[in-house]
């Protein structure tokens, strides 16, 4: 459902002159009217012409096109964001296909690696371990009192790039930009946070420009006590906030999620968001290929927290479709660097133990090896779906893909590792190795593949199809928690917007131009499920839709009226 056009009320603000021009949330630049220029002491501080936001956006687009590298484009857009946020979001929404890969993956990876080098202006909150005793004061320094969404990272596992220290701040900034651009959440309600607990990246420690705490990472009790101090301070300052954990290392991600998901409204996008968008994609792809997800056999390469999170959500979805838990688990095979996870494998992580296959059930497999490789698994399982979350490039070899295609006429192949340099196989190769028969969705953006004069659009299995809608749904409904059922309702809603399912052609996932419409639909489904689950106050469907409309921010200038502080 499209947002209703609503007349914006005037905004009463106390700032004036250069202070107002330096306030990104309020600055209009050349779009200040003559009356506003007189009332806010701006006469002579701006060129004579009063422009519309579209005229400003057109100039910015021309300037943007003058930059030749993606990182330079990223720096330029971040500069606009730190100068005039309304213009930034109008520009991004006008060119979302072009700019989403620049403000987020894959370009944000390079921006994180070079964070201290390209740093220009502070955005968000940096909380170092050295300042742990000032936690409450730090959060009180945030000028926005009505924060509704926080994205926090400790920078230890940034995309597939590893420990980037405070450079990881680029991820919360980029993620929250998508909450606004795709989900309509006002930038005034968002706060990026990095927990600076040191870094084990020697290159950063040796870099004279590095701006973070030059110390090896704290671990164990020190680490968890520090994170807990942060959580308690957030609860004190903004008790109803939605907190998203982002790019925490595998050893910490699941423990933190399990510890806090029932204490504060929170989720981990790497685990739950990735799982939700993947399951939504698989529901749609399964329908397009014929049948339900519960009928498919699935092999994973990568059994970390993200891979296991996806697997558990697939199992939950196939149970919804009628399988018993035992039958659902027998259809999912997890492969990591030591081979297939089985009940005979030592040193399994806690979240892996429920995803093992019984070794005794594999006695008739065609292999002589004790370590069951990905090729062994594909040859014997004959999967319908192959998912890569390994973070290692090239592991979906031609032999493996062709072996899969032997037994599956319409294979679903999803190399999800980020950034592009870490992808398990390129869509071009997968399409060629399957004679054009594979359904492909990737974690990073790829151009359409041309094979034998036919164009194959490649869907990006992008979490941005999920988390902005979840955030909007939580805010609109006032949900106090994010339940598994809320995430699954988001997946099902996403699948309903698949062009391939709706039209029999096109991508598995919607086009980016439709992402706000999809986010609004997901917000409604999530809010409705929150009410059914008892984590939000029950209202009518009309009231929930109205709350979504009321909370959906548009990149438009409002009239200003002056008031005193």
Curated annotation (Swiss-Prot):
Gene3D superfamilies: Malic enzyme, N-terminal domain, NAD(P)-binding Rossmann-like Domain
Cofactor-binding details, from the entry: Divalent metal cations. Prefers magnesium or manganese.
Binding-site positions, NAD(+): 157, 270, 418
UniProt xrefs under PROSITE patterns: MALIC_ENZYMES
EC number(s) from the headed UniProt entry: 1.1.1.38
Keywords, ordered alphabetically: Metal-binding, NAD, Oxidoreductase
Catalysed transformations (reactions): (S)-malate + NAD(+) = pyruvate + CO2 + NADH; oxaloacetate + H(+) = pyruvate + CO2
Site (Important for activity): 270
Active-site feature positions: 104, 175
Superkingdom of source: Bacteria
Molecular function per GO: malate dehydrogenase (decarboxylating) (NAD+) activity; metal ion binding; NAD binding; oxaloacetate decarboxylase activity
Binding site for a divalent metal cation: 246-247, 270
Signal peptide coordinates: none
One GO BP annotation of this record: malate metabolic process
This protein's record includes keyword Transmembrane: no
Cofactor: Mg(2+); Mn(2+)
Listed Pfam families: malic (PF00390), Malic_M (PF03949)
GO CC annotations on file: cytosol
Protein family: Belongs to the malic enzymes family.
Quaternary data: Homotetramer.
Protein name: NAD-dependent malic enzyme
């Amino acid at each position: 459902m499209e947002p209703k056009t609503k007349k914006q009320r005037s905004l009463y603000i106390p700032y004036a002159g250069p202070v107002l021009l330096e306030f990104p949330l309020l600055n209009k630049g050349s779009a200040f009217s003559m009356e506003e220029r007189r009332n806010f002491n701006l006469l002579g501080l701006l060129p004579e012409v009063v422009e519309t936001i579209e005229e400003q956006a057109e100039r910015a687009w021309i300037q943007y096109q003058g930059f030749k590298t993606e990182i330079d484009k990223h720096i330029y857009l971040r500069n606009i964001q730190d100068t005039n946020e309304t213009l930034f979001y109008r520009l991004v929404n006008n060119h979302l296909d072009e700019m989403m890969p620049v403000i987020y993956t894959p370009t944000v990876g390079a921006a994180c690696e070079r964070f201290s080098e390209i740093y220009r202006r502070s955005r968000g909150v940096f909380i170092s371990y050295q300042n742990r005793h000032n936690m409450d004061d730090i959060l009180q320094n945030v000028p926005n009192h009505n924060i509704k969404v926080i994205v926090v990272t400790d920078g230890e596992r940034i995309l597939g790039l590893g420990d980037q220290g405070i450079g990881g701040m680029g991820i919360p900034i980029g993620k929250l930009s998508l909450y606004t651009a795709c989900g309509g959440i006002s930038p005034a309600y968002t706060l990026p946070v990095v927990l600076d607990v040191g870094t084990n990246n020697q290159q950063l420690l040796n870099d004279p420009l590095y701006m973070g705490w030059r110390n090896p990472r704290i671990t164990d009790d020190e680490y968890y006590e520090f994170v807990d101090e942060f959580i308690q301070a957030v609860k004190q300052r903004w008790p109803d906030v939605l907190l998203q954990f982002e790019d925490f290392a595998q050893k910490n991600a699941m423990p933190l999620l399990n510890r806090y998901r029932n204490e504060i409204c929170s989720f981990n996008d790497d685990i739950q968001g990735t799982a939700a968008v993947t399951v939504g994609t698989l529901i749609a792809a399964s329908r397009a290929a014929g049948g339900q997800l519960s009928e498919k056999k699935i092999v994973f390469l990568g059994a970390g927290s993200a891979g296991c999170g996806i697997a558990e959500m697939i199992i939950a979805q196939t149970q919804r479709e009628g399988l018993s838990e035992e039958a659902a688990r027998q259809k999912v095979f997890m492969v990591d660097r030591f081979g297939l996870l089985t009940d005979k494998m030592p040193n399994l992580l806690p979240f892996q133990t429920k995803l093992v296959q019984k070794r005794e059930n594999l006695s008739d497999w065609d292999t002589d090896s004790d370590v069951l490789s990905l090729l062994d698994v594909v040859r014997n399982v004959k999967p319908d779906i192959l998912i890569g979350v390994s973070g290692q490039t090239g592991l979906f070899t031609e032999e493996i893909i062709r072996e899969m295609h032997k037994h599956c006429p319409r294979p679903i192949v999803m190399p999800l590792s980020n950034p592009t340099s870490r992808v398990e196989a390129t869509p071009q190769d997968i399409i060629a190795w399957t004679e054009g028969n594979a359904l492909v969705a990737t974690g990073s953006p790829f151009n359409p593949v041309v094979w034998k004069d036919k164009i194959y659009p490649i869907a990006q299995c992008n979490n941005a199809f999920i988390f902005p809608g979840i955030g909007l749904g939580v805010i609109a409904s006032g949900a106090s928690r994010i339940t598994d059922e809320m995430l699954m309702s988001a997946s099902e809603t996403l699948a309903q917007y698949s062009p391939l399912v709706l039209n029999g052609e096109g991508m598995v996932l919607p086009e980016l131009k439709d992402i706000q419409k999809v986010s609004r639909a997901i917000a409604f489904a999530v809010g409705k499920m929150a009410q059914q689950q008892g984590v939000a106050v029950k209202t009518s469907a009309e009231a929930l839709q109205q709350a979504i409309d009321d909370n959906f921010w548009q990149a438009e200038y409002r009239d200003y009226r002056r008031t005193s502080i």
